[in-house]
Amino acid sequence: MATPDQKSPNVLLQNLCCRILGRSEADVAQQFQFAVRVIGSNFAPTVERDEFLVAEKIKKELIRQRREADAALFSELHRKLHSQGVLKNKWSILYLLLNLSEDPRKQASKVTSYASLFAQALPRDAHSTPYYYARPQTLPLNYQDRSTQAQSSGSLGSSGISSIGMCGLSGPTPVQPFLPGQSHQAPGVGDGLRQQLGPRLAWTLTGNQPSSQTPTSKGFPNALSRNLTRSRREGDPGGTLEVTEAALVRDILYVFQGIDGKNIKMSSTENCYKVEAKANLNKSLRDTAVRLAELGWLHNKIRKYADQRSLDRSFGLVGQSFCAALHQELKEYYRLLSVLHSQLQLEDDQGVNLGLESSLTLRRLLVWTYDPKIRLKTLAALVDHCQGRKGGELASAVHAYTKTGDPYMKSLVQHILSLVSHPVLSFLYRWIYDGELEDTYHEFFVASDPTVKTDRLWHDKYTLRKSMIPSFITMDQSRKVLLIGKSINFLHQVCHDQTPTTKMIAVTKSAESPRDAADLFTDLENAFQGKIDAAYFETSKYLLDVLNKKYSLLEHMQAMRRYLLLGQGDFIRHLMDLLKPELVRPATTLYQHNLTGILETAVRATNAQFDSPEILKRLDVRLLEVSPGDTGWDVFSLDYHVDGPIATVFTRECMSHYLRVFNFLWRAKRMEYILTDIRKGHMCNAKLLRNMPEFSGVLHQCHILASEMVHFIHQMQYYITFEVLECSWDELWNRVQQAQDLDHIIAAHEAFLNTITSRCLLDSNSRVLLNQLRAVFDQIIELQNAQDVMYRAALEELQRRLQFEEKKKQREIEGQWGVTAAEEEEENKRIREFQDSIPKMCSQLRILTHFYQGVVQQFLVLLTTSSDESLQFLSFRLDFNEHYKAREPRLRVSLGSRGRRSSHT
């Protein structure tokens, strides 16, 4: 018998079978026959013959192993290889290299597991249709260690083949040399044989070694048992259905997408996914499936919100950006699911065992979906937190989730925030650089009221929606943003300044994409703040320059001080002198054009004539509403017309304050004017009335009372002029000079008016004080009237006495009797009547003095109890010598206690 060639394929294959199984040639005859049949079959990988696809897999594998440099080197070498064209089968070489490189660490374990090769392959491959097996590149191939079965009763392979011989063949199957190139068995015979072998081998494999998986699987079910084991309890009376892990995996992948599986369905009552009660599962698999199904619930929650809000047009651009961000995250999630689905489909299509490390199990899904679950939980929390929000409020809700210590979660939310905030920043840059507000759905924190007219543009047309201010924008920044756009619109619409914005502001690059927005968020305190500050300062400076140079805002403010606050002393005094004959008349007899003529005369006769014509033409006379008994002094007022841009600072409310302050100052000035006339009367009539010694007591009382009134009015005028007007004006002027925007000027001006209004006793808290002060003013007018009557009576009496003496001297010169008895009696009677009227005059003066002092004392008591320190100090000045303190116990207690508190402090 010829010795077979030791290098022939038959001998090598037989030696390989002996080496793997560790048996003699006689014992491996049946396995050798099967091996020959397998080699002669049509097994081929089903991977697509794509050279570049394999190259990409190699690069990904290198990157996964953190060998980026090797991946780059491989890419360069592959490029050179492709360009040279020396090799013809590049795909085959790359595919070989890829398979050779896979999992070299598992080689040691494979040596001991070769014995199970045929035990695994026989039941699957002994049928008519050959399987095309291509192992996934991401999952390593592994065989179970079945070394323990060699110590059991016979080998699995021999028992399987003997059963085949007994059940399927009439005799032993001869070993045929199935070498490449030789003819195969007849198709009919081979097909029929394999159709009988398949189920018998499967049953033999599963029935003979039920415990062989236990030590090697370590809790992971074998892929063969998952795919081929069928429930034997389907006909049980309990109706329970044994579910394999493979079926659970398939259901879970559907649940991940929100689709009910065969065994896992959504419970509408409990709002969660639950495993069917009839499914026969151990507690571990059931709990794992429920944990995995949570991803489906999270997916449904996010998908439902995104789909519903995407169709809501009123949700606005910010909301649509949020929905787009959610869809983008779901897209990444779907990409993972597609990979898992392809892996599962590959296992089903191949029909071969991929090994424990290659198959999809619930525990592997639990590990692989750990990070996606965190992302979905974060997105679901965002969805809950953003319910009912839109615009800047929605951006604030997203921004709140960036304040976390988890870098993974923080990066996710920051990415979403960059998308969500992009419309807000687009609104913002359009507003600060163009002054345009295109906020159809009211998402921006700047609101516009189209019904407001131009004259109220600055005050009422543009406001802040505080609820829409994103939390990453401070209130100071939002106020500046409002002022920038408002300044641009004010210049265009009110000042009629059509200067392009680019000449006012150095326009920088805005947030043109979410990437720009993301970059901007990384430096909110510097880059973003710098843009806002630059636009704010440049726009505000340009606006103030226009108001000061073109519209003379500061000159108009000084004109208010000179004319309405009586700062132009010579003009006011001369105007009073000219108006006195007119204003003493009843108010109903006055005509405005007459008073306007007098005003123009006073302007031409004083330094007011040197003011700008623009200012003088705005100065006018105004008559207040007339009440019964009013004189011209009660209804006369100066007015200053404002319009255009300056009306934004000098609003109607401000002009109303000016009018009230002017009336108060005008009345106080009139009191000073009256007391001056009283003092003139004293000085002029003192010499004339020396010949009437009986009238000296009246003159003395008038002089004392007038002196008290002069002291009071002088102190009040000093307080009003210096402590109120001058100090407040100096503070206003300093603030106006330092103002950075128009709002600062308006605020300073309003604060100035509020200060002088309250300190001039014109606010609601000082009505009692003002009434007392008006009562003092009324007593001054009463003194003037009483003194005029007394002087008139005294001068008439003096005139009659002089006439009597003159007549007497004239008669004596003519040689007649100077006076007859009847004439002398009549003269004496008239003198007695005059002398009898003097006590009445003195009594009237005493009553007037008493009433005046009582009013002043009450006024001082009110001053000491005022919360304004300047008014408290005014009480010291008015009663510096404690004249009224000695007369009024309440004043004495109040002043004493206040003095003790001051000294103690």
Curated annotation (Swiss-Prot):
Q: What is its main location?
A: cytoplasm
Please provide the record's keywords in A-Z order: Acetylation, Cytoplasm, Cytoskeleton, Microtubule, Phosphoprotein
**Region spans: Disordered:** 174-193, 206-239
Pfam families for this protein: GCP_C_terminal (PF04130), GCP_N_terminal (PF17681)
Report the GO terms under cellular component. centriole; centrosome; cytoplasm; polar microtubule
Keyword Signal attributed: no
Is Acetylation one of the keywords? Answer: yes
Q: Which residues carry this modification: Phosphoserine?
A: 113
Q: Which residues form the signal peptide?
A: none
Biased composition range(s): Polar residues: 206-228
The modified positions for N-acetylalanine read 2
The record's note on quaternary structure and interaction partners says: Component of the gamma-tubulin ring complex (gTuRC) consisting of TUBGCP2, TUBGCP3, TUBGCP4, TUBGCP5 and TUBGCP6 and gamma-tubulin TUBG1 or TUBG2. TUBGCP2, TUBGCP3, TUBGCP4, TUBGCP5 and TUBGCP6 assemble in a 5:5:2:1:1 stoichiometry; each is associated with a gamma-tubulin, thereby arranging 14 gamma-tubulins in a helical manner. Gamma-tubulin at the first position is blocked by TUBGCP3 at the last position, allowing 13 protafilaments to grow into a microtubule.
Q: Which PANTHER family has this protein been placed in? A: GAMMA TUBULIN COMPLEX PROTEIN (PTHR19302), GAMMA-TUBULIN COMPLEX COMPONENT 3 (PTHR19302:SF14)
Q: Function of this protein?
A: Component of the gamma-tubulin ring complex (gTuRC) which mediates microtubule nucleation. The gTuRC regulates the minus-end nucleation of alpha-beta tubulin heterodimers that grow into microtubule protafilaments, a critical step in centrosome duplication and spindle formation.
Q: What is this protein called?
A: Gamma-tubulin complex component 3
Source organism per entry reads Mus musculus
